[in-house]
């Protein structure tokens, strides 16, 4: 049925291609806004697509969901701030986490250790 509908519309059957420029606009928005709350609606607006298409395209192009990408970038930023000597609470706030507990939970979930343990490993 899908092939017949595509043929009737004058389009070849198959999947549409991912919109790289839109996904890249969302990615750039993420990088510019890490210290602030970021919603999928904001990303969709920055990309110029609806949230469902953006989510599909983002995953297809970058291999992860927009939410996971934001979380990994925040963890990267928090680690840089911690390595630069910032207290954990300040690093959490600077990287856009709601509090130090949120940073710790996500850090353990992703890396298997607390940020404090990771910091001590850096200095040992």
Where are the model-predicted features located?
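Short coil/turn helix-boundary motifs
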Residues: 33, 37, 85-86, 122
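Basic/polar phosphate-binding segments, predominantly the helix-turn-helix DNA-binding elements
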Residues: 31, 37-73, 92-118
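Short alpha-helical segment immediately N-terminal to, or the first helix within
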Residues: 29-33, 80-84, 94
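An amphipathic alpha-helical interaction segment
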Residues: 1-31, 41-49, 53
């Amino acid at each position: 049925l899908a092939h017949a509908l595509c043929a009737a519309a004058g389009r070849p059957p198959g999947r549409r291609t991912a919109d790289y420029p839109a996904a890249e606009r969302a990615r750039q928005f993420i990088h510019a806004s890490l210290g602030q709350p970021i919603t999928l609606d904001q990303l969709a607006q920055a990309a110029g697509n609806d949230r469902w298409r953006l989510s599909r395209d983002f995953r297809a192009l970058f291999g992860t969901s927009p939410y996971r990408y934001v979380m990994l970038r925040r963890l990267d930023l928090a680690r840089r701030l911690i390595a630069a000597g910032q207290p954990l609470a300040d690093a959490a706030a600077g990287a856009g986490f709601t509090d130090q507990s949120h940073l710790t939970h996500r850090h353990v979930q992703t890396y298997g250790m607390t940020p404090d343990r990771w910091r001590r490993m850096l200095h040992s």
